[in-house]
């Protein structure tokens, strides 16, 4: 796979150029010989909220993993506009309960990209961690073990870790799945605020209400892109019925 860092713009009919934060072309990826992404081509607009929508197994998590750099694509091109490396928040189930880490230690891991694993945190690093924990409302959980936290608390700690990376590209895999309404609303408001502050946010979601409130939508089925654009144009009743119709 080819990875490039540059600037790309597209011009909608009758509109102004829209900057792309990420463009991917003919991506292919999978697990141990099982293909998941198949000739996937699309883009993520900068300074916007993009929702990845599709059934289980459609390739949402794999695409996020490729964009985050934690999954290697076997073919295709991936182009990033100028910016910091992406921050990735995996599904809650991907983070084990038995990890012997406190909430604060988990958030501090967000500084490893800049400091390295063995170098001590600087005063600035600690300030960044404090700020991220305060923003997510988890400062009072600093000394608690990760495995002791509720689902909503743990998810906020993981998002705080991503904020500690100070990235302008945030990738989240089902960030509100399984959370109570209050926790979902809190995270939704935070992500909206981050976009307003200049962060590009991409989230995989089964929540059609959340997808409809996004700025852009990528519709996936069987590892292929079957729709891309504004949610009101992509998430039509016909498209959604086809999406979950048995193959």
PLM regions and their residue ranges:
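The feature captures the beta-strand-to-loop junction immediately N-terminal to the Walker
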Residues: 53-55
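Helix-to-loop junction immediately C-terminal to a conserved catalytic motif
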Residues: 68
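Conserved ABC ATPase "signature" region
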Residues: 123-141
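Conserved ABC ATPase signature
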Residues: 145-149, 153
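Catalytic Walker B motif of ABC-type/P-loop ATPase nucleotide-binding domains
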Residues: 170-174
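Helix N-cap at the start of a conserved alpha-helix in ABC-type nucleotide-binding domains
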Residues: 181-183
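H-loop (His-switch) and adjacent beta-strand-loop-beta switch element
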Residues: 214-230
């Amino acid at each position: 796979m080819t990875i490039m860092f540059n600037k790309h713009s597209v011009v909608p009919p009758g509109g102004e150029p829209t900057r792309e934060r990420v463009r991917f072309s003919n991506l292919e990826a999978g697990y141990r010989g099982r293909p998941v992404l198949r000739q996937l081509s699309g883009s993520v607009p900068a300074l916007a909220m993009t929702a990845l929508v599709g059934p289980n197994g459609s390739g949402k998590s794999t695409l996020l993993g490729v964009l985050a750099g934690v999954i290697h694509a076997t073919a295709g091109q991936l182009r990033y506009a100028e910016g910091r490396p992406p921050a990735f928040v995996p599904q809650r189930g991907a983070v084990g309960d038995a990890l012997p880490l406190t909430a604060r230690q988990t958030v501090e891991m967000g500084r490893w990209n800049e400091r390295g694993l063995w170098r001590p945190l600087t005063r600035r690093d600690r300030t960044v961690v404090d700020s991220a924990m305060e923003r997510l409302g988890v400062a009072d959980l600093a000394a608690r073990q990760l495995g002791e936290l509720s689902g909503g608390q743990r998810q906020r700690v993981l998002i705080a870790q991503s904020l500690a990376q100070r990235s302008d590209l945030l990738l989240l895999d089902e960030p509100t799945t399984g959370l109570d309404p209050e926790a979902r609303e809190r995270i939704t408001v935070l992500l909206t605020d981050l976009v307003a502050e200049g962060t590009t946010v991409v989230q995989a979601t089964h929540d059609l209400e959340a997808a409809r409130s996004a700025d852009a939508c990528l519709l996936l089925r069987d590892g292929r892109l079957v729709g891309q654009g504004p949610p009101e144009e992509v998430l039509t009743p016909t498209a959604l019925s086809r999406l979950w119709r048995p193959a």
